[in-house]
């Protein structure tokens, strides 16, 4: 029995869909959506949905640097009954997380991974909308701004996907699929897209 725990509905959805594509029955649990699969031994969930009374064989806890978040950080400190736990985080969280493990009297092994693609900063200012290219992700901070920018791009004939927190789950899934498949050229999103979500963003 396994469980994936992440900070975002979008991440839980991504893992759920990858499991299903691999032929693994998977249940998805988030604050707004529950999808139960028959004979499922795997759960993909937002971290707050963890049932601490359940026992698991293996667990993946993602984006554990969120432990420093003043509103949600406590959710990454709850105990999970599991002999093998994989905790994914940025290096900044390593000291805090390993200290908690030691307080519990448990052991750990650290594995570090390097980013496969280099992050490159643009040297010149970005001119919107003239310099928008296929594969771009435009990040804004409100739903209103997402819809405004997407509307401006669509009026110029640029097919656009939109992602923001309150988007209904089925529509959100469709928007992600369309961008991943190249059916839309650009994605406009709130900053939630930046936390672990795997999309074919070029810039």
What are these regions (language model features)?
Residues 1-2, 6, 10-43, 48-60, ...:
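Helicase motor core with emphasis on the C-terminal RecA-like subdomain
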């Amino acid at each position: 029995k396994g469980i994936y725990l992440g900070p975002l509905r979008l991440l839980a959805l991504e893992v759920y869909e990858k499991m299903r594509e691999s032929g693994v029955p998977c249940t998805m649990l988030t604050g707004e959506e529950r999808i139960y699969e028959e004979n499922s031994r795997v759960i993909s969930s937002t971290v707050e949905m963890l049932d601490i009374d359940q026992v698991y064989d293996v667990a993946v806890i993602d984006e554990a640097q969120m432990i420093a978040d003043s509103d949600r950080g406590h959710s990454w400190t709850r105990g999970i009954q599991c002999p093998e736990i994989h905790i994914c985080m940025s290096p900044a969280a390593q000291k805090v997380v390993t200290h908690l493990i030691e307080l519990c009297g448990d052991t750990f092994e650290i594995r570090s991974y390097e980013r496969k693609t280099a992050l490159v900063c643009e040297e010149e200012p970005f001119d919107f909308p003239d310099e928008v290219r296929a594969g771009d992700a435009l990040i804004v901070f409100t739903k209103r701004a997402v819809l405004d920018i997407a509307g401006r791009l669509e009026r110029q004939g640029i097919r656009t996907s939109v992602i923001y927190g309150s988007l209904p789950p089925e529509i959100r899934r469709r928007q992600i699929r369309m961008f991943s498949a190249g059916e839309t050229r650009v994605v406009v999103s709130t900053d939630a897209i930046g936390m672990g979500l795997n999309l074919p963003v070029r810039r």
